[in-house]
Each structure stands twice: as structure tokens, then as C-alpha cells.
């Protein structure tokens, strides 16, 4: 009797586990929800532009970035560091669903930021171009996407400072820093490694490696937490300041920056 009771209990538990597994598909649920959110963004673009001041419209907003506290969709211009994230999300939706609806949307929003391929005033080339054109090229093998990516990589390395061994980040706040390099910049190196694989040009590989090693040396503390901003002397390459621009204080670990480094 005890054996039968135990066996029945085991079967009930196994059945419950099996049922729970069938009812929960985290990946599908996540993509379904993401699809709903992205489609909602499409419906809000026109109204968001209609409510924008003329000055904002002159900046040519093209990519949804977030929802404001008042429920309005926030759009950003191609020059914004997040402009490549939305088209990147659309490419992931296409990859998962194989639905041409998402492919067409991804192509349209990707094309909106092509002008950034020659923007030498930003270090965010990987964020913008590799998330968008990079995923597009990976999924379609479009030769035009490849050329745009290579031009983007060539633009990015113009910001490399050999004396320092890093790609310069921001150009603003010159009264505060000479040559700021932020931990976020690690995320842009993938574009350079890709360019090396595609072209065989070791310049891309060497710059990416040197930047990573310099960052490892100067951005990280003994406990492996990281600073957000390292400011370098443009002539000597020496470290001038170790700051945390968006974290709690200069000696804190800014969580988002810590993730960028990883």
C-alpha cells in the first residue's frame, strides 16, 4: 500500500511538472510581448511627431527610444546613441518569426540611420550601426549593409589615440576632461573585430585589442569594479582623472557601466 501511495504521488508530481513545462514557454512569451510593444510603437510614431515642437522636428527623429512618464512615445534622431537599438530589435523579431513584416520594418528603420556611417564625432558606432546594419547583414547577407558597416568601422578608428591606446569617447565637457574614455566604449569593439574578419586588415584588430587592454589596466579597481570615465593626457597618455559621471560617486560601481565592461 505504501509503495502504491508513493508511486501515485510520484506520478502526480511528474504530471504537474510536465504540465507546467508545457504551459510555460519563456522565449515565445517574451517575443510575443516584444512584438506587441514594437507594433504599439509603430502606431504612436505619427502622433509623437505631431506633438513635437518644430525645433525637435528639425533634428529629424527616426527611432523610438522609450515611453515617457506621460505615456508619449519618445523619438530620437539618428545621431542619438540609442538610434540603432530599435532597428536591431526588429531584426531579432524577423530572425525569430521569419515573418517578412518584421523584415520590411527592420529594413526601413535601419535605412533611417545610414547617415551615421560617416559621423566621426561619436564613439557609439557599434551601438548604432552594428545593432542595426550588423544584424541586417547577418540575416540577409546584403552587400550594401556590409559596405556601410565597413565605412562605419573606418570612421570609428579615426577617434583612436595612439599615445593613449584608446578610442576617444566624448567630445563635450572639454573644461572637465582632456580625453575621456568611458567603459561603455567596450561595446563598440565588436564592430572592429568584425571588420578585421571581413577585410583581414589588422589595424582594426590591433586598435580593438589595445583599447581593451588599456581599459583593463586603467578602468578596473582591485576588486574588479570599474570606473565610468578615465580621463587621459592627450600628450603624455597619462591618466589624469578617474571619474564616475553617471553613477553615485567617483568611487562607486555604476551598475550599467559594469555591465558594459562585461
Question: How would you name each of these model-derived features?
Answer:
Residues 1-25:
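Bacterial Sec-dependent N-terminal signal peptides
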Residues 21-262:
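Glycan-recognition and catalytic cores of secretory/periplasmic carbohydrate-active enzymes
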Amino acid at each position: 500500500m505504501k509503495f502504491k501511495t508513493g508511486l501515485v504521488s510520484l506520478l502526480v508530481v511528474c504530471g504537474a511538472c510536465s504540465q507546467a513545462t508545457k504551459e510555460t514557454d519563456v522565449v515565445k512569451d517574451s517575443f510575443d510581448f516584444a512584438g506587441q510593444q514594437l507594433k504599439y510603437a509603430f502606431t504612436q510614431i505619427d502622433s509623437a511627431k505631431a506633438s513635437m515642437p518644430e525645433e525637435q522636428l528639425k533634428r529629424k527623429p527616426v527611432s523610438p527610444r522609450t515611453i515617457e512618464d506621460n505615456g508619449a512615445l519618445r523619438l530620437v534622431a539618428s545621431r542619438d546613441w540609442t538610434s540603432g537599438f530599435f532597428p536591431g530589435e526588429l531584426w531579432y523579431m524577423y530572425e525569430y518569426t521569419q515573418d517578412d513584416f518584421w523584415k520590411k520594418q527592420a529594413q526601413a528603420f535601419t535605412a533611417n540611420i545610414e547617415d551615421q556611417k560617416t559621423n566621426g564625432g561619436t564613439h557609439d558606432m557599434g551601438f548604432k550601426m552594428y545593432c542595426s546594419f550588423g544584424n541586417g547583414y547577418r540575416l540577409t547577407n546584403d552587400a550594401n549593409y556590409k559596405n556601410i558597416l565597413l565605412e562605419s568601422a573606418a570612421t570609428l578608428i579615426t577617434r583612436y589615440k595612439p599615445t593613449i591606446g584608446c578610442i576617444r569617447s566624448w567630445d563635450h565637457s572639454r573644461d572637465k576632461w582632456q580625453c575621456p574614455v568611458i567603459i561603455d566604449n567596450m561595446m563598440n569593439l565588436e564592430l572592429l573585430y568584425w571588420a578585421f574578419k571581413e577585410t583581414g586588415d589588422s589595424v582594426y584588430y590591433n586598435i580593438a585589442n589595445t583599447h581593451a587592454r588599456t581599459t583593463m589596466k586603467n578602468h578596473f579597481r582591485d576588486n574588479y569594479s570599474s570606473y565610468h570615465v578615465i580621463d587621459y593626457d592627450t600628450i603624455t597618455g597619462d591618466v589624469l582623472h578617474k571619474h564616475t559621471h553617471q553613477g553615485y560617486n567617483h568611487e562607486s560601481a555604476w551598475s550599467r557601466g559594469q555591465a558594459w565592461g562585461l
